[in-house]
């Protein structure tokens, strides 16, 4: 077995970025990451988690995922888009999330952009979907960004989205399964054998 795959406490082989002691990351890896979805709230959640991960670690973000879900109304785009300055002030004091005002404001602005953007985020995600014949053989094969992610980020910025650089957009693409970067040998990889 490759060093890019670890065996979890449950005996399942996973991508090595999931530490065996991090149940929040393992749950996200097993149930969400790399699973193709075009559901509006799932797309908004992935986009939001990427905004908050910028400059931090995914472990911190995964540990606060339930807090984000509560703070941002279950990632209901209309409700988040209707949030006010008072709501933002309240969230800056909420210890269940990452209390970064710029990222909270970006999340509200991104919800507003999602409500008005054409083409929609789902349509854009579909247009950038990657079909691979084989899974990456190692973590080293997984890029931080791609030309497709750069183009996708540029389109999102033109629609008013914030905190959407090529690296965070590539992470978004991974999160929603537009690209499946589960490493060969992981039980979620497309070609496990």
Task: List each language-model region with its residue ranges.
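HhH-family (HhH-GPD) DNA N-glycosylase catalytic core used in base-excision repair
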Residues: 1-193
């Amino acid at each position: 077995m490759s060093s890019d795959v670890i065996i979890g406490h449950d005996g399942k082989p996973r991508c090595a970025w999931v530490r065996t002691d991090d149940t929040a990351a393992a749950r996200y890896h097993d149930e969400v990451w790399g699973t193709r979805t075009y559901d509006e709230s799932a797309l908004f959640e992935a986009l939001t988690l990427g905004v908050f991960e910028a400059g931090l670690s995914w472990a911190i973000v995964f540990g606060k995922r339930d807090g984000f879900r509560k703070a941002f109304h279950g990632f209901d785009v209309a409700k988040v888009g209707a949030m006010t300055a008072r709501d933002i002030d309240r969230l800056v004091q909420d210890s269940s999330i990452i209390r970064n005002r710029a990222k909270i404001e970006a999340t509200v602005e991104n919800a507003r952009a999602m409500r008005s953007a054409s083409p929609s985020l789902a349509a854009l995600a579909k247009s950038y979907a990657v079909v691979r014949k084989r899974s990456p053989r190692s973590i080293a094969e997984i890029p931080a960004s791609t030309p497709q992610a750069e183009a996708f980020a540029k389109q999102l910025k033109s629609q008013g989205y914030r905190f959407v650089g090529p690296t965070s957009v590539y992470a978004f693409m991974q999160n929603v399964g537009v690209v499946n970067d589960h490493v060969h040998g992981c039980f979620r990889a497309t070609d496990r054998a």
